Amino acid sequence: MGVREQLERVAAYFGFGVDDDYYEDEEEEERYAKGSYGNGGRTGEPSPAVRRLGRSERSSAFGTSLGDLFGSEGPERGRYAHNPPHLRAVPDQRPTRVSVVEPSSFNDAQALADRFKRQQPVILNLQNVNSDLSRRMVDFCAGLTYALDGHIQTVANRVFLLTPRDVEVSAEERKMLAERAFFNQL
């Protein structure tokens, strides 16, 4: 038996490929007509020792079906279907400190991303940075906030606030951070 035949048998077992059950009746009729069934002199009856199992018979022969494996018929799977467990989120009560980053090169982007990944809001001050680095940092931060479901807001001219998912910065805090970033340039 070749590799192709083995792959076809495996595919047929799992329900892929051509459904041979459809053609089986025609083949059996041809075999009976030709008398090529070797059934020990009996006519009209196939040999009981060898027969092909259909899909439903195959699943019952092995004690399971694909519906049992992947469906919701099992008792464990249906346990929470009607009464899901009661879970409640506990808010994090720790005060979150906002960090200010004033990059001098694009290498500072990694430190910014590490802080952001730790769910820490970041102020990005690009007021003293050349336009090429500023553009690269804004593009990086836009991708970072998108990938981690965060938000990016303009706080002042060339000053941005990056807030992680599920973190809020109050309006007063934003205003204070913008003033702090503005006075840092003096």
Curated annotation (Swiss-Prot):
Question: Which UniProt key words apply to this protein?
Answer: Cell cycle, Cell division, Cytoplasm, Septation
Spans annotated as Disordered: 24-91
Query: Signal peptide span per the entry?
Result: none
Q: Which GO terms describe its cellular component?
A: cytoplasm
InterPro entries membership? Cell_div_SepF, Cell_div_SepF/SepF-rel, SepF-like_sf
Q: What main location does UniProt list?
A: cytoplasm
Localization per record: Cytoplasm
Per its UniProt record, what Gene3D superfamilies does this chain match? SepF-like protein
Report the record's Gene Ontology biological process terms. division septum assembly; FtsZ-dependent cytokinesis
> Which PANTHER family does UniProt cross-reference here?
CELL DIVISION PROTEIN SEPF
Q: What is the protein's quaternary organization? A: Homodimer. Interacts with FtsZ.
Q: What is this protein's function per UniProt? A: Cell division protein that is part of the divisome complex and is recruited early to the Z-ring. Probably stimulates Z-ring formation, perhaps through the cross-linking of FtsZ protofilaments. Its function overlaps with FtsA.
Q: Which family does it belong to?
A: Belongs to the SepF family.
Designated name of the protein: Cell division protein SepF
- Taxonomic placement: Bacteria, Bacillati, Actinomycetota, Rubrobacteria, Rubrobacterales
